[in-house]
């Protein structure tokens, strides 16, 4: 009887000391400091592709000292999507990722990025974001961007970094693949430094 009473008192004391965790705190518990949502180019495999995604992911994690989540957007990346101006489903997915992260992790820095058709997807996603969610995007980075000359909505234009190589006709809006379009991997360290400077 005495043991039961003591155990009950001990459990009560522990419960009293443990502060209740609110729903918001629970959702924020697993937040990263930095999120990068990246869309690969046409025909690339996986969600990160091969030309830019893996190198950018590694470079960002090296350059940014805080915790980072680098996530590839799952979308078909078909030629038909590029010719249509970018895959709409992929853009919706990216926009939803931003909105959900902005709501769940109010202190996180959020970046969106894309290569080739992925850059188109990034532009389309930016247009789908509410003004409040656009304000939560810390920066936009694109490579081989067919929409290089198109302004991003709201204040995102001033938080934009675009890489377009000399001789890359995709950047000129022409559906012609030449060697300069496949060398953006060398720009990933610079892009990572640009991101790190804004964290």
UniProtKB/Swiss-Prot annotation:
Residue ranges listed under propeptide: 19-27
Biophysicochemical property: pH dependence: Optimum pH is 7-8.
GO molecular function, one term: cutinase activity
Annotated signal sequence range: 1-18
Marked site: Transition state stabilizer: 117
PTM notes: The 2 disulfide bonds play a critical role in holding the catalytic residues in juxta-position; reduction of the disulfide bridges results in the complete inactivation of the enzyme.
Pyrrolidone carboxylic acid modified-residue sites: 28
Record-level GO BP terms: carbohydrate catabolic process
Record bears the keyword Disulfide bond: yes
Keywords per UniProt: Disulfide bond, Hydrolase, Pyrrolidone carboxylic acid, Signal
Its job: Catalyzes the hydrolysis of complex carboxylic polyesters found in the cell wall of plants. Degrades cutin, a macromolecule that forms the structure of the plant cuticle. Also degrades suberin, a specialized macromolecule found in the cell wall of various plant tissues.
Name of the protein described by the UniProt record: Cutinase CUT1
